[in-house]
A protein has these predicted regions:
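N-terminal secretory signal peptides that target proteins for export/translocation
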Residues: 1-11
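Bacterial N-terminal signal peptides
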Residues: 15-27
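Interaction/scaffold regions that mediate signaling and macromolecular assembly across diverse proteins
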Residues: 36-94, 98-174
Length: 174
C-alpha cells in the first residue's frame, strides 16, 4: 500500500512539473509573440510618424490628393531607419495573411517613397527606368533580408496574397 501511494504521489508530482513547464513555455511563447508584434508596431509607428509629418492635402493638375513632401522627407533620418527595419525584419514574424498584407504594402510604399526621395527632384518614379528596364525591375532595397524590386513585391508577393484591394493601396510614389 505504501508503494501505491508513493507511485500516485510521483505521478501527481510529474503532472504538476509537466503542467508547470507547459505554462512556462506558453508564457515564453507569449513574450516572443509580443516582441515580434513590438518590432512590427515600432516599424508601423515610425512609418505613420513620417506620413504625418510629410504628407498633406494638396492639388496637382486640378486634382485634390494627399501629397508627399519629397524635398523635405529626403533629409529625414527616419526614412533610413525605416529601410533598415524593413531589411532586418524577420520573415517568420509575418505569421498571418493580415500581417503579411499590411507589412508588404507598407514595404512597397516605403521603398517607392525612398526611391523618389533618393532621386529628388523627380517628376515621376517611372522616369528612373527605361522601356527595356522599367524602374519596377530595379533593385529597390532589402525586405526581410532579401533583395527586392517593386515588381517582385507587387506581383510575386502582394498579388499572391489574394487581396483584391491591393492595387488601390499601392501608391507607386505618385
Amino acid at each position: 500500500m505504501k508503494y501505491q501511494s508513493k507511485a500516485l504521489i510521483d505521478y501527481k508530482f510529474l503532472y504538476v512539473v509537466v503542467l508547470s513547464l507547459s505554462l512556462i513555455g506558453l508564457s515564453l511563447l507569449s513574450r516572443v509573440s509580443q516582441a515580434q508584434d513590438l518590432a512590427l508596431t515600432e516599424l508601423n509607428t515610425l512609418y505613420q510618424a513620417l506620413l504625418n509629418d510629410y504628407v498633406s492635402p494638396g492639388e496637382k493638375n486640378g486634382l485634390t490628393a494627399n501629397m508627399v513632401n519629397y524635398a523635405e522627407i529626403r533629409h529625414d533620418d527616419r526614412l533610413n531607419d525605416l529601410m533598415t527595419r524593413l531589411q532586418n525584419y524577420p520573415l517568420e514574424n509575418l505569421d498571418t495573411k493580415q500581417k503579411k498584407t499590411a507589412f508588404y504594402l507598407n514595404a512597397y510604399n516605403i521603398l517607392s517613397i525612398t526611391k523618389v526621395a533618393d532621386n529628388w527632384p523627380l517628376k515621376r518614379l517611372k522616369s528612373l527606368g527605361s522601356f527595356f528596364k522599367p524602374v519596377w525591375t530595379h533593385s529597390a532595397g532589402k525586405v526581410c533580408g532579401e533583395k527586392m524590386t517593386l515588381r517582385i513585391l507587387e506581383r510575386d508577393i502582394l498579388q499572391q496574397l489574394g487581396e483584391p484591394r491591393i492595387h488601390f493601396a499601392l501608391n507607386c510614389a505618385s
